[in-house]
Amino acid sequence: MGRVRTKTVKKAAKVIIEKYYTRLTLDFHTNKRICEEVAIIPTKPLRNKIAGYVTHLMGRLRHSQVRGISIKLQEEERERRDNYVPAVSALEQDIIEVDADTKEMLKLLDFHNIRGLQLTQPNTNNFGRRN
């Protein structure tokens, strides 16, 4: 079984990832050296724990977002997806097929001048009945 990570390790790892995401990798030894360069970590075991958690989070970040970590690249990607507008609307149709009852209801609601309305015969299947 693994060990429980302290609040200090988790917070330090998240801050390091947010600031130095582009320099970090999925390799523990590389991340250990980067943590040593960018942060003042008092003890060697604490540095190794932070580097291990950074490596763990980098693996999770590769697949999806991690709660509590905001990376500019992911923010920009999310912003682009949210603001995407297709060239042709999926809701726009040239012909809308309606039956007689629906057309009458639209006429009563003053929607009788909608373009593309086409009257169709309702499909009456006698399911389960034999001739």
Curated annotation (Swiss-Prot):
InterPro entries: Ribosomal_eS17 (IPR001210), Ribosomal_eS17_CS (IPR018273), Ribosomal_eS17_sf (IPR036401). GO terms for molecular function: structural constituent of ribosome. One of its GO terms (biological process) is cytoplasmic translation. Keywords: Ribonucleoprotein, Ribosomal protein. It holds the Pfam family Ribosomal_S17e. GO terms for cellular component: cytosolic ribosome; cytosolic small ribosomal subunit. Belongs to the eukaryotic ribosomal protein eS17 family. NCBIfam families: PRK01151.1 (NF002242). This is Small ribosomal subunit protein eS17.
